[in-house]
Structure formats: structure tokens, C-alpha cells
Amino acid sequence: MPDKNIVEDVIGDLVDNFTETVQKNKHGSSFFEQEDSVSSRFNRLFDRQKPIHHVLGGGKSADVLLWRNKKISASVLMGATAIWVLFEWINFHFLSLVCYALLLGMIAQFVWSNASGFLNRSQSRVPRLVLPKDFFAEVGVAVGKEVNRGLLFLQDLACKGNLKQFLMAVIGLWVAAMVGSCCNFLTVLYIGFVGAHTMPVLYERYEDEVDGFMDSMIMKFHSHYKKLDTGFLSRIPSGKFGLKKRE
């Protein structure tokens, strides 16, 4: 069947392009010699014009995601891993963690406030933890802002974005849905956190190779879509599924 052959051709081209990319990186000229030519030949991912550090915000958060300070980035990743292991593998519950933290805090304050009497010293002021009044309001505003920005981004891709941007978003959402069906919410958050701390730095290091590979995939998709359109889609009558106007 022609449709089956087209699908097989698409899969075969994906494998061939990936193999060619690996072989070029191994046997081709050096990366620094080809950087200018590759940059001018391929479109950047999501048609961006600015460096990846600027796209990520350009501040301390971007430095952490791009591992500008390896100690801080590694500490953040290890902290997230410890939390995930604590809740997922050890089956520790959030309520238990909060209660134990409050218990340790109360014991520490009790010892601090009463130690001066046992040691015959002047009573020192016990430090207290007080959250700012606007803390939760600022957190809610920040979360709502990011959610609205994500929704606006997806809607712009669906209504105004080109085919490359749309396909990247569709593939990303499909992969997220597959991962979500196999893991719980905490594991999905951890996978997303690890991806956010590894994929940007890997993309920055292999930026031209990734952009070139994606550009070649889009070109292959366009060619196979034209074959599918001329061989199958164009034969479907345009008014077959339309509703007839009634006076």
C-alpha cells in the first residue's frame, strides 16, 4: 500500500539522517571549522535569534541551568534527587516530613531558650522563622504568570507558528503524555527538573548538530507530506464531508 510505504520511508529517513549525522561528526572536519557555515545554513530551534543563555532569562537561573557554576548546579540537582528518593523510594510522606521538621525546630528552640539557665549564662534571643506577608501572594502571581505564558506560547504555536515549531510542541506534549501514563506526578516533576538541568547545557554544547538534524527532519517531512498529498489526500473530494446548504 502507498501509505504504508510512505510511513516506512519516513522511518528509514530518520534512521539514515541520524546515522549520517553521527558519521559526519566522527569523520568530518572539526566543529570549530564548520561553525560559521552550519550556523548560516540551518535555522535555530524555534527560530530563535538570541543565545540560549538570553532565552533562559540571562540571570542566575540561566547560569544554574547552563552549569556556569558547577557546584551550585550540582547541589541543586543533588537536592532534587534526594527529595525524589526520599518520597519515591523510601515512601516518606509529605505530612510526616513537615511534622518532623516542625518537631526538630521546636526542640532546637526549646534547647536554645533553656540552655542559658543550665549553663548559668544570660538568656540569648532565640531566632524565629517568620514568612513575609506577601510571600504566598508573590508565589501565586509568579505561578499564574508562568502558566499564562505557557498557555499563550502553545496557542501562538497552534495559530501563528510555523510547521517546525508546531511539530516540536506536539512531539513534546506527546512524550510528556506517555511519561505521565507510566509515572506518578512526583516522578514526572523530577524527570522534568532533571531535563531542565541537562538538556539546555547539552543543546548549548551541540547546538549546530541539533539544529541541523532538526532542519533536515523538517525537510524530509515536507517532502513526504507532498507525496502523501499528491498520492492520497488530493484524491479526497473536498465536498464529501461538507454539509449541504439548505434554504
UniProtKB/Swiss-Prot annotation:
Localization: Endoplasmic reticulum membrane
CC per GO annotation: cytosol; endoplasmic reticulum membrane; mitochondrion
Protein name per UniProt: Reticulon-like protein B8
Reticulon domain segment(s): 61-247
UniProt keyword annotations, A-Z: Endoplasmic reticulum, Membrane, Transmembrane, Transmembrane helix
Its membrane topology: Multi-pass membrane protein
Annotated signal sequence range: none
An individual GO BP term: response to bacterium
Keyword Endoplasmic reticulum (UniProt): yes
Positions of transmembrane segments: 71-91, 92-112, 166-186
